[in-house]
Amino acid sequence: MADKHLDARKGDSAHYQIDAAINRIAWAGDPDHNLLGILSTGQNIPTYTITAGGTSGQTSWLKKDADEILQDLMNMYSQVSKSTKNIERPDTLVLPTNIYTALSMKRVGDTADTVLTFIQRNAPFLKKIEMAAELNDDSVETNPYAAASNGSGVALLYTNDQKKLAIHNPMAFLQYPVQVRNLETIVPCEARTAGMIIPFPMSALIAIGV
């Protein structure tokens, strides 16, 4: 371990814990303090329930083929477009980590394409596809639809524009000078967040059951 002053390590630990707490709030909110996350029902972001594919008969994207997944995406995009009279055009898709990994490694038939590259080429409205462990089906701290077993992973389709949605942190992490109390050192730290601010909830969509 690199030589590092104890006070600096305490500060790093506090910074990590505060960042982790803000991240949880950004996704799931904090009902005790009336803070909303992007997946909080109070945000009024529309939801879309994944249905069984016509060929596979499955709902999970782990078991669907590329065409069925693409159809789900088209249905998701169409729901946003129709409900907003084509004003909102989401351009970013965030997937659970296991779904993203599987799609990036699973080939389409005997071609050189993976399911992920197939989607990127055939869904031109998507500028970016990302992954987030917070959306996993067992991420109970950040995904309201998750559970220890038999939970639902979710996908988030949204417009990557801070005018549409953004986390508001009035105070970034602040570390005060070291204080000595009763033969121990104290490193006071604080940060403040207002959670996710989403003026245009119809610009996003939460797909349940991927």
Model-assigned labels for residue ranges:
Residues L39-T114:
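Extended, solvent-exposed, turn-rich assembly/linker loops in the middle of proteins
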